[in-house]
């Protein structure tokens, strides 16, 4: 199955092809392109950028990737199909049918969509917007010629004609319009001849080429396949047979350009079948090339001891576990492919990567090591892609072939003996101005087992070389420095000064005492080997007389050092095994540090989410306390109404219950229950109690509205706070039921019911009854005393006795009158008692209304907060578990590193 382009949201198949083993067609071709932004922060790692700053200087901004430039190259699955449309085709005719065809093509086969600008700028922009919304993250969208429109719609890049802008200008313009992207924009070049194609691929740094459909274009493609290492898409002529298409793909064409007409005729389906067929055939052929007899001694691990074999197997197991944990902790971390690749290469040949500035002589050094001029040399950048050199024992010249493989590597199979156990990789210069080539080198460095840094004697340790050395420190790589072109020095003293300069500064940069440096003249060594190439059967090391030329002798010393890596019985050979095993260990340690930083940040974010949720709940509780404080004013107003009514009633009682109110007393005494309500009691009902009750009902109604509006407003604010704080967390868990919303509306209005149960008429009647009783007792007492006195004087015989009887009866009347104020005060006390009881009852009712409202508010917010808190807590628990797993795997890696460091110690020595 072919790997998907990297910007799709797919993390289920992260195991990319080994960067050092010969890759298979159909895998991912790394290109400099823009892709739609991802979800979270997992692909932007918390890693310090040390490429352009001093080692002790802290970057002010967070580096966006593991690589010093801060940019990455996306991946494109090839062979594939490129759909080329015209804006008029999209906007005119049956638009829905066109978009439907494109949609189905994107789902089945198309990886790149190019829209031509034959229409007006406005129509092109509108068509680009339509396609952008349709393409989404399924493919790359390129705009022909119009960099401004590509920038405006956020396209993946542009396709430029020969007369268009330079590729580097277009790329820089697109990068400037989207500074937040970590991926380089994609720039394609539509070419017509070999010369323009060569310029576009080498000098301009185009990402891929598009050819026409004519016979001449096919011939151009045949010529380009021999010299161009970037993908080439050929336009379908419509009359090729499947066999011809398959042959084109086998020859190295990366895919076909199709049109809307091809979609309507289902031609894309047939082409897709051809692409799949080419993948199967090329995959089979490449596997056959890899299954060479010399391949049986993988990684040069010959005659390993049981202890060493055990460590190798243990490392594979621990690193696979590390990969699983990294996938679990950071599913979108693409850099884990570095570790996956390194683990897959443990059993592969030792990987020696040649790095350095362009024109430092990297290709010449490699040619000298191989004993033949296999690689192109020049004063301008000649290596535009990663060039992978593998061993082949087939001596036939036609079998010494190089292939462009879909993972971005140019793989050459050569019969050089040194390649049997060491794979050599040539890389673009560290100082090339084309960012795509620089990213190639930066991304390949972590995979290296040994870095051979080629310095040019005329400019040793330039600024770009120093920056590159700082970048490589994070991968803990071993360096071998080659001071090439050393023959430019006039004498040994100048050479020694240069060697001292390089060693002293590299010691400081790499913080190491052991700096391995060989001053050589690769060109002289190569010429010496070529001049004696007729000496068949002799080893390359014996070709030149060591004493004949110090330049050749110095190169021979370099070769001896490299060949010593092949013998595991020597100290250098043991170091090779250690370096081979430490390559994935260094990558694992670097990735673990990044993942641990991410997990720590996520833990902090989860804790902050919990704290934020608790803060919203606490804020609600504080608001409830604030409402309780503000409710005091409402209670005072309500109690004031009761108190005012009480005072008026008491004052009325004091005015009414007087002995001078003879007419009122006679009315109460002689008419009794049959008498109508007097003016005083009518005043109590109509002018005091009725208005007071009306005002109280109005006040308590407003109080209930105040409670409801405040709780509803605060509940709504809390709900919005949760939704605004976590806008993406909206699912069934956060959907509130009707009962929950009813909490904010629910109120029993106990205080209002308390007042509604009171009746002004009933209360005034009770008061009138009490007043009637006072008058009846008082006036009745006076009347009884007078009647008794009359009867006694009529029956008593003497005057003295009459006077005594009158005195006694008068005393009884006096007692009745004397008790009148007491009875009046008793009524006032009764009124006060009733008023106090009512006030307490009303205050309790208002407090209950407040308690119910605030309790419902807090309950509502707790219900709203529950799913958010649970989600944050689950996330925190999961992250804490991941932290524990990361800590455990780091401990395992540390123990494994100790075993690797002790590889050179035998079991007997370990026992001692």
Swiss-Prot record:
Which InterPro entries does the protein's record reference? Answer: Aldolase_TIM, GTP-bd, P-loop_NTPase, ThiamineP_synth_sf, TRAFAC_Dynamin-like_GTPase
**Annotated TM spans:** 774-794, 802-822
Which superkingdom heads the taxonomic lineage of this protein's source? Eukaryota
Principal place of residence: plastid
Q: Which residues form a coiled coil?
A: 877-904
Q: Region labeled Disordered — which residues?
A: 51-71
Family the entry assigns: Belongs to the TRAFAC class dynamin-like GTPase superfamily. Dynamin/Fzo/YdjA family. Mitofusin subfamily.
Q: Which keywords does UniProt give here? A: Chloroplast, Coiled coil, Developmental protein, GTP-binding, Hydrolase, Membrane, Nucleotide-binding, Plastid, Plastid inner membrane, Thylakoid, Transit peptide, Transmembrane, Transmembrane helix
Q: Does the keyword Hydrolase apply?
A: yes
Protein's gene = FZL
Cite the residue span of the transit peptide. Answer: 1-54
Q: What does this protein do?
A: Probable membrane-remodeling GTPase that plays a unique role in the in the determination of thylakoid and chloroplast morphology and regulates organization of the thylakoid network. Not involved in the determination of mitochondrial morphology or ultrastructure.
Extract one GO cellular component term from the record: chloroplast outer membrane
Task: Give GO terms: molecular function aspect only.
Answer: GTP binding; hydrolase activity
What is the consequence of disrupting this locus?
A: Pale green leaves phenotype and delayed flowering. Decreased number of chloroplasts and heterogeneity in size in mature mesophyll cells. Abnormalities in chloroplast and thylakoid morphology, including disorganized grana stacks and alterations in the relative proportions of grana and stroma thylakoids. Lesion mimic phenotype with activation of defense response markers in the ecotype Landsberg erecta.
Task: Please identify the protein, giving its name as recorded.
Answer: Probable transmembrane GTPase FZO-like, chloroplastic
One Pfam match, by short name? MMR_HSR1
Q: Which organism is it from?
A: Arabidopsis thaliana
Cellular localisation = Plastid, Chloroplast inner membrane; Plastid, Chloroplast thylakoid membrane
Which membrane topology describes this protein? Multi-pass membrane protein
Q: Name one GO biological process term.
A: vegetative to reproductive phase transition of meristem
The chain's Stromal topological domains, given as residue ranges, are 55-773, 823-912
Q: What is its EC number?
A: 3.6.5.-
Residues in compartment: Chloroplast intermembrane: 795-801
> What CDD domains does the database record attribute to this sequence?
DLP_2 (cd09912)
**Residues that bind GTP:** 359-364, 521
């Amino acid at each position: 199955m072919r790997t998907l382009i990297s910007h799709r949201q797919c993390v289920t198949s992260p195991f990319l092809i080994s960067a050092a083993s010969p890759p298979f067609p159909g895998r991912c071709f790394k290109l400099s392109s823009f892709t739609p932004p991802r979800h979270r922060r997992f692909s932007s790692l918390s890693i310090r950028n040390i490429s352009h700053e001093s080692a002790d200087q802290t970057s002010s901004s967070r580096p966006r990737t593991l690589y010093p430039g801060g940019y990455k190259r996306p991946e494109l699955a090839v062979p594939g199909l490129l759909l080329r449309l015209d804006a008029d085709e999209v906007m005119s005719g049956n638009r829905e049918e066109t978009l439907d065809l494109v949609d189905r093509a994107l789902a089945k086969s198309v990886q790149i969509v190019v829209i031509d600008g034959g229409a007006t700028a406005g129509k092109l922009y509108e068509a680009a917007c339509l396609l952008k919304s349709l393409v989404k993250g399924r493919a790359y969208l390129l705009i022909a010629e119009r960099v401004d429109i590509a920038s405006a719609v956020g396209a993946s890049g542009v396709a430029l004609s020969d007369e268009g802008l330079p590729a580097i200008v277009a790329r820089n313009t697109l990068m400037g319009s989207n500074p937040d992207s970590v991926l380089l924009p994609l720039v394609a070049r539509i070419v017509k001849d070999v010369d323009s194609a060569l310029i576009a691929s080498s000098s301009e740094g185009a990402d891929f080429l598009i050819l026409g459909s004519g016979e001449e274009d096919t011939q151009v493609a045949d010529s380009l396949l021999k010299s161009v290492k970037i993908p080439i898409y050929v336009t379908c002529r419509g009359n090729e047979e499947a066999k011809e298409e398959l042959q084109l793909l086998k020859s190295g064409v990366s895919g076909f350009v199709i049109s809307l007409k091809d979609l309507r005729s289902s031609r894309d389906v047939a082409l897709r079948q051809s692409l799949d067929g080419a993948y199967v055939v090329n995959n089979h052929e490449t596997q056959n090339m890899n299954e060479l007899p010399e391949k049986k001694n993988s990684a040069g691990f010959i005659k390993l001891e049981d202890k060493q074999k055990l460590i190798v197997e243990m490392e594979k197991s621990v690193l696979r576990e590390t990969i699983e944990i990294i996938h679990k902790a950071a599913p979108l971390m693409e850099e884990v492919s570095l570790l996956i690749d390194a683990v897959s290469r443990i059993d592969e040949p030792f990987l020696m990567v040649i790095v350095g500035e362009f024109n430092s002589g990297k290709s010449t050094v490699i040619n000298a090591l191989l004993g033949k001029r296999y690689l192109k040399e020049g004063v301008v950048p000649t290596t535009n892609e990663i060039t992978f050199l593998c061993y082949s024992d087939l001596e036939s010249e036609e079998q010494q072939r190089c292939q462009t493989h879909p993972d971005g590597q140019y793989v050459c199979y050569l019969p050089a003996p040194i390649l049997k156990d060491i794979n050599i990789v040539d890389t673009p210069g560290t100082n090339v101005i084309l960012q795509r080539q620089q990213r190639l080198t930066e991304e390949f460095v972590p995979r290296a087992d040994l870095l051979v840094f080629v310095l040019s004697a005329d400019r040793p340790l330039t600024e770009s070389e120093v920056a590159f050395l700082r970048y490589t420190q994070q991968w803990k790589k071993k360096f071998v420095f080659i001071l090439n072109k050393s023959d430019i020095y006039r004498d040994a003293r100048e050479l020694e000064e240069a060697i001292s300069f390089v060693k002293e500064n590299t010691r400081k940069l790499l913080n190491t005492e052991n700096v391995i440096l060989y001053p050589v003249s690769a060109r002289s060594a190569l010429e010496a080997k070529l001049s004696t190439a007729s000496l068949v059967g002799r080893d390359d090391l014996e070709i030149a007389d060591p004493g004949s030329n110090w330049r050749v002798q110095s190169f021979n010393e370099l070769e001896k050092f490299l060949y010593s890596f092949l013998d595991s019985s020597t100290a250098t050979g043991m170091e090779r095994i250690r370096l081979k095993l430490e390559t994935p260990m260094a990558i694992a340690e670097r990735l673990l540090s990044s993942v641990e930083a991410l997990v720590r940040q996520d833990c902090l974010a989860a804790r902050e989410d919990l704290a934020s949720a608790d803060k919203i709940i606490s804020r609600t509780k504080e608001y409830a306390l604030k409402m309780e404080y503000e409710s005091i004013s409402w209670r005072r107003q309500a109690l004031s109404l009761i108190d005012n009514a009480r005072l008026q009633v008491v004052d009325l009682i004091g005015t009414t219950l007087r002995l001078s109110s003879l007419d009122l007393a006679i009315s109460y005494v002689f008419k009794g229950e049959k008498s109508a309500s007097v003016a005083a009691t009518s005043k109590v009902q109509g002018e005091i109690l009725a208005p007071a009750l009306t005002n109280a009902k109005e006040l308590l109604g407003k109080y209930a509205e105040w409670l409801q509006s405040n709780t509803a407003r605060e509940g709504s604010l809390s709900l919005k706070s949760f939704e605004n704080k976590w806008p993406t967390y909206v699912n069934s868990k956060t959907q509130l039921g009707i009962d929950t919303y009813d909490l904010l509306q629910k109120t029993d209005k106990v205080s209002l019911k308390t007042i509604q149960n009171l009746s002004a008429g009933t209360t005034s009647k009770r008061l009138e009854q009490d007043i009637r009783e006072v008058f009846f007792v008082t006036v009745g007492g006076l009347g009884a005393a007078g009647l008794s006195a009359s009867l006694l004087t009529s029956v008593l015989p003497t005057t003295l006795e009459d006077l005594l009887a009158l005195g006694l009866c008068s005393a009884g009347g006096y007692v009745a009158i004397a008790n009148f104020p007491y009875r009046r005060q008793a009524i006032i006390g009764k009124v006060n008692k009733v008023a106090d009881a009512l006030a307490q009852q009303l205050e309790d009712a208002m407090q209950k209304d407040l308690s119910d409202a605030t309790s419902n508010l807090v309950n509502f917010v707790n219900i709203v907060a529950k799913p958010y808190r649970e989600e944050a807590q689950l996330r925190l628990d999961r992250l804490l578990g991941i932290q524990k797993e990361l800590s455990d795997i780091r401990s395992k890696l540390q123990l494994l590193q100790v075993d690797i460091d002790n590889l050179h110690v035998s079991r007997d020595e370990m026992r001692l």
